[in-house]
Amino acid sequence: MILTVTLNPAIDVSYPLNELKCDTVNRVVDVTKTPGGKGLNVSRVLNDFGETVKATGCIGGESGDFIINHLPDSILSRFYKISGDTRTCIAILHEGNQTEILEKGPLLSVDEIDGFTHHFKYLLNDVDVVTLSGSLPAGMPDDYYQKLIKIANLNGKKTVLDCSGNALEAVLKGDSKPTVIKPNLEELSQLLGKEMTKDFEALKEVLQDELFEGIEWIIVSLGADGVFAKHKDTFYNVDIPKIKIVSAVGSGDSTVAGIASGLANDEDDRALLTKANVLGMLNAQEKTTGHVNMANYDKLYQSIKIKEV
């Protein structure tokens, strides 16, 4: 079983408009509301793929109830209730553009943070892999993911971390390391303080930096150009075919789902990397975020090319 953690989930609201007019009324006819957050996207893709998954995180208020009520029944909801209201994130789609208005989310108390920590320990009993995705809610310290990873490691669970900024830096500088991290080139550049490109030799050099010591898998997203990955002392380039992209939103989360599934099933390097990339591409072919059409899985699977570099 795979446990997905979304500490700062949201209701994602989409407002499609022909034209966005400022300082006046804009009326929306076709409103879409879905449970949002990177970890929930991971949950839905794992569910589509047929994995057993349970989802946790911190939710509160009517917005939190909405998230529980609108997840597929086959996803085991194990959320921790807090006093604050779960945030709403609005995307206004207009004239080929997307304008986003993102709430910060609730402020968690010390007692609520401690409560979730105990809740997390309890949820580990029957899982093999834990995914940790997205931003931390207000009130949580930057090193909170480090704390969860330490607990998971002590319980013999594999962890996949997909975050950025201070939260990622705190983990890399900490004593407990995740099994997998999945930065993109921009996030890698931010970590290292220098611009990184798709130069494989340069990537090989930086991924051996002591900053990443102790992390079994480092999977660097290259967008439409695939992936550059390091597993222990072996490096891989994953070449993916060109596809028609409907929406790339959530494709990174779908890739995380594939990584988690590969770890849970003890797959070899090539199988894990292939599955992860196929699920990312399948999501990009869909309008709905965090959804994959498995009818196209086998064809894309055969088109992935992996070589050691």
Swiss-Prot record:
Pathway: Carbohydrate metabolism; D-tagatose 6-phosphate degradation; D-glyceraldehyde 3-phosphate and glycerone phosphate from D-tagatose 6-phosphate: step 1/2. Coiled coil: none annotated. PROSITE patterns: PFKB_KINASES_1. Its EC number is 2.7.1.144. It catalyses: D-tagatofuranose 6-phosphate + ATP = D-tagatofuranose 1,6-bisphosphate + ADP + H(+). The keyword Heme does not apply. InterPro entries: Carboh/pur_kinase_PfkB_CS, LacC, PfkB_dom, Ribokinase-like, Tagatose/fructose_Pkinase. GO terms for molecular function: ATP binding; phosphofructokinase activity; tagatose-6-phosphate kinase activity. One of its GO terms (cellular component) is cytosol. Keywords: ATP-binding, Kinase, Lactose metabolism, Nucleotide-binding, Transferase. GO terms for biological process: D-tagatose 6-phosphate catabolic process; lactose catabolic process via tagatose-6-phosphate. The keyword Nucleotide-binding applies. Gene3D superfamilies: 3.40.1190.20. HAMAP family: LacC (MF_01557). Belongs to the carbohydrate kinase PfkB family. LacC subfamily. This is Tagatose-6-phosphate kinase. It comes from Streptococcus pyogenes serotype M2 (strain MGAS10270). The gene is lacC.
